[in-house]
Amino acid sequence: MGTDDLGKGEKILNGFQINWMILRDADTGKIIWQENKDFSCPDVEHEAKVPVKILSLRAVSREINFSTVEAMENFRLDQKVLFKGRIMEEWFFEMGWVSPNTTNTWQSTIEAAPESQMMPAKVLNGNVTIETSFYDGDTLISKSVVRLYYI
């Protein structure tokens, strides 16, 4: 099957990869966690070991560095935070146009839920997954799942 036979989403995915991801304290800029791993791969459940102190931060700055062969007209992410399979939070991020054959860094800020809604790390540990759907407009590129462990 040639690339002309592939659907748009599959064609983008074939030339797409996440190079690294960094989470920072949004107030201080201090790096809390970083990983050089392609979290966009849809065929496996990924794991991330994140310091427990991330749960006490007011906001987290997330940087995603990615490369793409194909142009994307409206690159965006939909993320669902699930606890034991039930949606706790849902976030929507839009980057917009991405040029072909480029490497890009995308920074987003995620504010914490109110303290009254937070659960302890020992309850969350291993029971939280983040389901990320990568889109170009309405075309699904990939859906990945990352299970969180707090250390």
Swiss-Prot record:
Keywords: cGMP, Cytoplasm, Nucleus. It is found in: Nucleus; Cytoplasm. The keyword Cytoplasm applies. GO terms for cellular component: cytoplasm; nucleus. GO terms for biological process: sensory perception of light stimulus. Interacts with Pde6. Belongs to the PDE6D/unc-119 family. This is Probable cGMP 3',5'-cyclic phosphodiesterase subunit delta. It comes from Anopheles gambiae (African malaria mosquito).
